[in-house]
Amino acid sequence: MKLIFIHGSGGSKEAWRYQVEHFPSAEAIDLPGHPRGKPCTSVDGYVEWLRNYIHERGYSKVILAGNSLGGGIVLLYALKYPGDLKGIITIGSGARLRVHPMYLTQLEEAIKNAKLLEEFLEKRWELIAPELKEVMRRRAFENGPVVFLNDYLCCDKFDIIARLGEIRVPTLAICGSQDIMTRPNTPTTLPATSGEQER
C-alpha cells in the first residue's frame, strides 16, 4: 500500500510535512510547475500526470489524499482509474471548486506586484504553525502568482457533482470549521451522494 499526499493550489509537498513524518510509508509530491516543469491547465491534466507518476514507480493499492485542488485531483482520479486505488481522502475540497472572482482578480494583480501575493496568502495561513508557515511561504514565492492563478482557474472550471455517485472506492472527506475556501456545510464537500459510499 502507498499513501500519497497532494497539495492544493500554488502549494508544495511541504504542506504535508507532519503527515509524512507520522506515516512512514507516505509520500508527498510536488505537482508539475510547483516550481519545476510546466503546470497543467486542468484538473484532468494533473490526474493524467499523477497516474503516470504512480505507474512509473510501480505503486499499487494506492491511497490518495488531497487538499483543495489536490482533493479535486483525487476525486477525478477515483472516477477515471478506480482500479489503481485502495481509497481516497479529500481535505477541504469538493466536487465543485468555484473560486470567487475577487480572488482571481487579486492574483492577476499579484502577477504585476509580487507584494500582493504575500497579502493574499497571509489571510489564508493564519492558523498554520509558524515553523511550517515560513517554509510554505518560501515555496509559494518560488511557485509565484502565475502558478497560483493557473491552479485557481483549474479549480474554477472543475465540476464533477453529477458523477459523484459513480465513485466506488472507500472515501473519507475531512472539512475544517474555519476553512475560508471550502465550508463544511456545503454539500459539494461530500465526495459521494450514494448511500453505498463510505464517507
Model-based region annotation:
Residues 167, 173-175, 179:
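Short beta-strand/loop motif that positions the catalytic acidic residue
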Residues 1-38, 43:
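Conserved HGGG/HGGXW glycine-rich cap/lid loop of the alpha/beta-hydrolase fold
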Residues 187-199:
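Catalytic histidine neighborhood in serine/cysteine hydrolases
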Residues 75, 79-80, 85-115, 154:
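Flexible "cap/lid" loop of the alpha/beta hydrolase fold
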Residues 98-101, 115-166:
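Conserved alpha/beta-hydrolase catalytic His-Asp/Glu region
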Residues 180-186:
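Conserved alpha/beta-hydrolase "acid-adjacent" motif
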Residues 66-70, 74:
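Gly/Ala-rich beta-loop-alpha elbow adjacent to hydrolase catalytic centers
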